[in-house]
Amino acid sequence: MSTAAPTAKRRTRDTWTSQTGFLLAAIGSAIGLGNIWRFPGVAYTNGGGAFLVPYLVALLFAGIPILWLEYAVGHKFRGTPPWAFRRMSAKGEFLGWFCVFICFVIITYYAAVVAWSSSYVVYSINEAWGNDSKTFFLSSFLGTVGSDEFSWTPVLAVSVPLLLVWVCILLIVSFGVSKGVEKANKVFLPLLVVLFLALVVRALFLPGALEGLNAFFTPNWSALTDSKVWIEAFAQIFFSLSVGFGIMLTYASYLKKKSNVTGTALVAGFANSSFEILAGIGVFSALGFMAHTQGVAVSELQGLRGPILSFVTFPKIISMMPGGPLFGVLFFSSLVLAGITSLLSLLQVVSGALQDKFAMQPIKASLVMGIPATLISLALFGTRSGLNTLDIVDNFINNVGVVGCAVAMTLFTALVRPRLAGLRRHLNSVSAPAIPPVWDFLVGIVIPAVLTFMLISSLIKSLRNGYDEYATYLVTIFGWGSVAIALIASAILTLVPWSHPQRTSTTPTDQEMA
């Protein structure tokens, strides 16, 4: 394989046009569906206001440090995970591709949730779910089969908007980083914040809102003695910040060489957490109204997290409140925007990796990635089994795939040159504030220990009890199978020779290893 190439074949790697553009994209990636439908319920069931203590500890001592790690690797080695880790050690390329395929699996089902949300924007106008939002969501809309069944029968109400979502996001990514992802985030993220602020303000003035806020913020200090609460806090931070599987590493690789990396990470981290708390205020103000209207306590309400919160509980609230259709349009539009900004970041990891390895232009990489992803997405998540399959894949790809990837990433960067001290020196040479030496201890020992505990706990629970009430064959095929496919695909891509003229050498310079 030649290590040289004609100058004409060389292409300049895309970069963010400004630090602000990068920051908006990073925040847009972090702010996703989980901020709105996961955090409020997790906080409420794990100590209420007291949950903010382990949550902030996790943010400061795990979330921000691992965010700095990804920024350091991406910015220093100027590539997506396969190339960046390969530059550190040839054996690291497999880990890089595992990050890429984790992202690939996630986008296939994440797009389906965005499609649901887009449909519900329209349904909100006339409250199409009627008096029984649960039956409408599970039966009329999704046509969901039993937990022990699987069906290939397509659901047009899902497939059509799902196809449109794919066309939209692939079109954006095909324009590259600066002209596509950056410009889209400059529009979508501010719009998301404006819509969600309007939603929260409306919710705060509903009867019973104060009862909901009291339920959300009243601390149960005894919960702090429960290790499960602390693990939930760390899990929420890892998943909501989009760290541990290459997204932020990829985004940082498009920064200019002179960029304030550490300061941007702090802003992105705290912006994400601020939005989560804002989401908690909005969600529980609305839940307080629901409890007030039904004459029950907030603690008696069901469906306080996940898709059920968004597509069953909130439609009930919308039907109860004055001006409900407008509230519904605001809520589901917020879900669409949050989902799209996160989808773009996941897609860029895959597209960027293909561009790095095969010297593809963004539009070609989008097609090579997008066509199979769209077909898989429609075949698995646009059917009557879509909800069940999504639930299984999401559980395993996050709790096993993402966490396992994060464990491997922290250990790899701690053991392979330039090691953590070298990465810290790199960040401090271009950024402020400076990272203290304790960062090496947190990223090299504390964070891998916490992540390993989370991974082992998930593995033991899954091996002993399966997952929820789903049939064993479904859990095996779609749960363990999704992780296995990511591993196999990673091994195959690692063995494929590099064809990018500027990516043929694995030998890092002395300066890179310093």
What is each stretch, according to the model?
Residues I66, Y110-F136, V193-F217, F289, ...:
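Hydrophobic alpha-helical segments and their helix-loop junctions in multi-pass secondary transporters
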Residues R10-R13, V42-N46, P81-F94, F98, ...:
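Inter-helical loop and helix-membrane interface segments of multi-pass membrane transporters/permeases
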Residues V42-N46, A72, K76, R87-A90, ...:
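Membrane-water interface regions at transmembrane-helix termini and the short interhelical loops
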Residues M1-W37, I66-Y71, H75-R87, F94, ...:
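Membrane-interface "cap" regions at the ends of multi-pass membrane proteins
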Residues F358-G370, F396-I460, R464-G479, P508-A514:
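C-terminal membrane-solvent junction of multi-pass transporters and transport-like membrane proteins
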Residues S2-W16, T20, E182, K186-I340, ...:
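Membrane-embedded translocation segments of transport machinery
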Residues T17, L24-G34, I106, A111, ...:
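Hydrophobic, membrane-embedded alpha-helices of multi-pass small-molecule transporters
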Residues S18-A58, E211, I247-A252, T264-L266, ...:
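Transmembrane helix-boundary motif of multi-pass solute transporters/channels
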